[in-house]
Regions:
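Aromatic- and carboxylate-lined catalytic core of secreted/periplasmic carbohydrate-active enzymes
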Residues: 190, 217-218, 222-235, 412-424, ...
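Carbohydrate-binding surface patches
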Residues: 445-448, 453-455, 504-555
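C-terminal beta-strand-rich structural cap/linker in extracellular carbohydrate-active enzymes
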Residues: 315-319, 578-602
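N-terminal module-boundary/linker segments of secreted carbohydrate-active enzymes
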Residues: 2-53, 336-340, 348, 528
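Aromatic-lined carbohydrate-binding/catalytic grooves of carbohydrate-active enzymes
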Residues: 55, 59-171
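Glycan-recognition surfaces
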Residues: 329-333, 337-457
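Conserved, mostly hydrophobic/aromatic
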Residues: 41, 76, 110, 350, ...
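Extracytoplasmic
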Residues: 174-326, 535, 544-565
C-alpha cells in the first residue's frame, strides 16, 4: 500500500468509498463484524497528557484487585501524551520520561495480567495535544509499529486534519468541504445550445442544508456539502447533506459541455468552497463526470466547463460535495489497510474519534467498531491527584446529557453488523456528578450499547463502595453486552407525543422511557429523569406498547405481549416482583435518577 498524500486529498479508490455506497452493507479491508462494545479504561479523563507507564500499571493493578476484568473491563488505552513530540527516523517513539521501558514492555506486562493494550493516534498531521506524530502520510509505518507493540485497541482522533476545517486545522480547508456557490447551468454539444437551467426554476435541491442566496442580483445555491456534527446543534437523524440536481433530456449518446456559473470560497460560514463533484444518472447507472478542485481562473463567472459523457434519454445531473465524508472515510480506511497488511489475522478494536464531525454514523461501520458522535464529554480532565470535573448539563457537548441527547435517537445506526455509537468515555468518579447522576449515566451508556470506557483514577474506588457498585453492576453491564446487540429505543418522553424515538431534544426538563430488547426474550426498561426536580406525575408503559415500538427488533414479541404474567427485576436493588396486568409503572422519580428494570415474561 501507499501512504496517503500530504499535498491533496486522494482519488476515490473505488465505488465502495462513495457516498452512494454508505448503505451497501460492504465493509472495507475485511473489517470484523459482530464485536460487542469495548470495555476498559482510557487515560485521558483521568490524567490528560500526564499519563505514565507507572500510572497505567497502577490502573491495571486496580482493575485486577477490584475484579473489573472479570466483568469485561479489559482494555487499557494510552491516550494523547504518550509519544515524543517528533518522529524519530520517520517512526513513532515513546516519551522516554513517561514511558521509559517502551510500549512493547507495557503491552507485555498488561498481557501477562490477562488484560489488553490500547493506543491512540490521529488522522491529521499532529495529535490534539500538539505532538507532530499524526498518521497522515505515515500509515504504513505506524501500522507496523502498532503491530510490533502488540496493540489490541486503537483510538484515532481527527485534529489537524488536512482535508477539513477540523479542530486546529487550517480554516481555509473549507475549500475541500463545500462546493462553490452554484448558479445557472448550460448544456451544449458542439457549441450548439441544448438547454439552460436556473436555480429554483429547473434546478432543485435534494437532501438538507443547502441555502438559496441572492448574490449581486443573481440566485445561487450555497452550502453544498455535509452538516458539521461536532457540536450539539445538528440532529443526527435524517439526511445530513444536500445536492443540486437537474433533469436533462439528451438526444443521443455523446460528449456534452456542461457550463456552470459559480463562485468559489474558502469559508464554512459562507458555505462556499472549491471542490465540486458532478455525476450523471441514466437508466439506473451513475457516472462521475468531475470530482476535484476548481482551478483559480475558473472560480468566478460562467467559464467553468465539464466535458461530460452522457447517455441518450433523461439524465439526472447531480452537483454535490460529499468529500467531507468520503475523505475522512478514506483516511481512516488507509490506517486500517496498513494494519491488515502488516498482520491480516490480528484482532484490533478500531475506535474512531472524529467527534461526529462528518456524520460517521453513516459510514463509520465500514471500517470501525465504534465512532464518537460529538466533541468531548468533558474538557476539565484530571491529573495525578486531581480527579477532574464533569457536568450533567452544558450548552455544548461537555456534559452527560449533551452526549445522551444525541446518542439516544441514533439506535438505527448501531448493531452487531455495524458497530456502536460512542458518546465518549464515562465520567463516573470525576468531580461534579452526584450519586444519582452517576447511576443514571451508567444506565444511559449500558442501555445504548455504548463502549464502556472508564475515565477515572481507579485508585479512588474501593471494592463495594458507591462508585464500585455503579461501575461493577453486572446486570447493567449485561445489558450493554447482550448478544442481541440492539440499542435501546426511546419509546416515550413527556415533552412530545409521537416521534419520541427520532426527535432530537436538548431540553432536559423531562422524563424519558427507554426499552431495550434482550436475547432471551426479556426487555430492559428504564424510566429516566434528566431534570433537577423530583417528578411525581407517575409514568407507565404496557407490554403491548413496548412490543409495538420495538417491532421486529424483539426476540419473540408475541410471546412477550401474551405472557400471562411478568417477573420485574429492579437492576439496582435486585428486588423482584410479579406483574399480572402487563403495565409497568413508576409513581415518582427523584432528580437525575432512574428506575431500570428487566421484564421477564412468565
Amino acid at each position: 500500500m501507499n501512504n496517503s498524500s500530504l499535498e491533496h486529498p486522494g482519488a476515490i479508490p473505488g465505488q465502495e468509498y462513495r457516498f452512494d455506497a454508505f448503505e451497501d452493507g460492504k465493509v472495507l479491508h475485511k473489517k470484523k463484524k459482530g464485536r460487542m462494545p469495548a470495555m476498559g479504561w482510557n487515560s485521558w479523563n483521568a490524567f490528560g497528557s500526564g499519563n505514565t507507564e507507572q500510572l497505567t500499571l497502577e490502573m491495571a493493578k486496580c482493575i485486577k484487585e477490584l475484579g473489573l476484568d472479570k466483568l469485561g473491563y479489559r482494555y487499557l488505552v494510552l491516550d494523547d501524551g504518550c509519544y515524543r513530540n517528533e518522529r524519530v527516523n520517520g517512526l513513532l517513539t515513546n516519551d522516554e520520561v513517561k514511558f521509559p521501558h517502551g510500549f512493547r514492555y507495557l503491552a507485555d506486562r498488561l498481557h501477562e495480567m490477562g488484560l489488553k493494550f490500547g493506543m491512540y493516534n490521529d488522522i491529521g498531521t499532529n495529535l490534539c495535544a500538539g505532538a507532530a506524530v499524526g498518521t497522515c502520510g505515515h500509515e504504513r509505518e505506524d501500522a507496523g509499529s502498532y503491530i510490533s507493540w502488540d496493540v489490541d485497541f486503537l483510538k484515532v482522533d481527527n485534529c489537524y486534519y488536512l482535508w477539513d476545517d477540523a479542530t486546529f486545522s487550517d480554516k481555509e480547508n473549507a475549500k475541500y468541504v463545500f462546493a462553490p456557490a452554484l448558479g445557472k447551468v448550460v448544456i451544449r454539444r458542439d457549441e450548439v445550445y441544448l438547454e439552460e437551467f436556473s436555480p429554483g426554476i429547473n434546478m432543485h435541491i435534494v437532501g438538507n442544508g443547502i441555502h438559496t442566496e441572492d448574490i449581486d442580483g443573481k440566485l445561487f445555491f450555497t452550502h453544498i456539502g455535509t452538516f458539521d456534527g461536532t457540536g450539539p446543534a445538528q440532529t443526527p437523524v435524517g439526511v445530513e447533506s444536500g445536492e443540486v440536481v437537474l433533469d436533462a433530456d439528451i438526444p443521443e449518446d455523446g460528449t456534452y459541455d456542461i457550463s456552470i456559473e459559480l463562485i468559489c470560497g474558502r469559508s464554512s460560514e459562507s458555505g462556499r468552497g472549491e471542490w465540486l463533484q458532478a455525476a450523471s444518472e441514466c437508466s439506473q447507472t451513475t457516472q462521475y463526470q468531475f470530482d476535484g478542485l476548481i482551478d483559480g481562473k475558473d472560480c468566478e463567472g460562467s467559464g467553468f466547463c465539464i466535458k461530460a459523457s452522457l447517455k441518450a434519454g433523461r439524465n439526472r445531473i447531480r452537483f454535490m460535495n460529499h468529500r467531507r465524508q468520503e475523505n475522512t472515510l478514506m483516511s481512516y480506511a488507509k490506517l486500517l489497510e496498513g494494519l491488515k497488511e502488516a498482520a491480516p489475522d490480528r484482532d484490533i478494536v478500531y475506535s474512531l474519534c472524529e467527534w461526529g464531525k462528518t456524520q460517521p454514523q453513516n459510514w463509520g461501520w465500514k471500517v470501525a467498531d465504534s465512532w464518537r458522535i460529538l466533541n468531548d464529554i468533558t474538557f476539565a480532565v484530571g491529573s495525578d491527584g486531581n480527579p477532574g470535573k464533569a457536568d450533567w448539563v452544558s450548552g455544548y457537548t461537555n456534559s452527560v446529557t449533551s452526549q445522551y441527547n444525541k446518542a439516544v435517537v441514533m439506535d438505527e445506526f448501531s448493531g452487531t453488523d455495524r458497530g456502536w455509537n460512542d458518546p465518549d468515555m464515562m465520567v463516573i468518579g470525576m468531580d461534579g456528578l452526584n450519586s444519582a447522576q452517576n447511576r443514571t449515566h451508567m444506565v444511559m451508556w449500558c442501555m445504548m450499547n455504548s463502549p464502556l470506557m472508564l475515565g477515572l483514577d481507579l485508585r479512588r474506588v474501593k471494592k463495594g463502595d458507591e462508585l464500585y457498585r455503579v461501575i461493577a453492576n453486572e446486570e447493567m453491564i449485561a445489558l450493554d453486552q447482550d448478544k442481541l446487540g440492539i440499542q435501546a429505543k426511546r419509546i416515550y418522553t413527556d415533552l412530545i407525543g409521537a416521534g419520541s424515538d427520532k426527535e432530537y431534544i436538548t431540553n432536559n426538563d423531562r422524563v424519558d422511557i427507554l426499552a431495550k430488547p434482550l436475547s432471551d426474550g426479556s426487555v430492559a426498561v428504564s424510566f429516566i429523569n434528566l431534570s433537577g426536580s423530583r417528578k411525581d406525575e407517575g409514568y407507565s408503559v404496557s407490554a403491548r406498547e413496548i412490543a409495538e415500538k420495538l417491532g421486529d427488533r424483539m426476540a419473540g414479541p408475541d410471546t412477550f405481549i401474551n405472557a400471562g404474567s411478568y417477573v420485574i427485576r429492579d437492576l439496582w436493588t435486585k428486588e423482584e416482583s410479579k406483574n399480572c396486568d402487563g403495565v409497568f409503572r413508576i409513581n415518582d422519580l427523584e432528580a437525575y435518577d432512574n428506575y431500570t428494570i428487566r421484564i421477564i415474561p412468565g
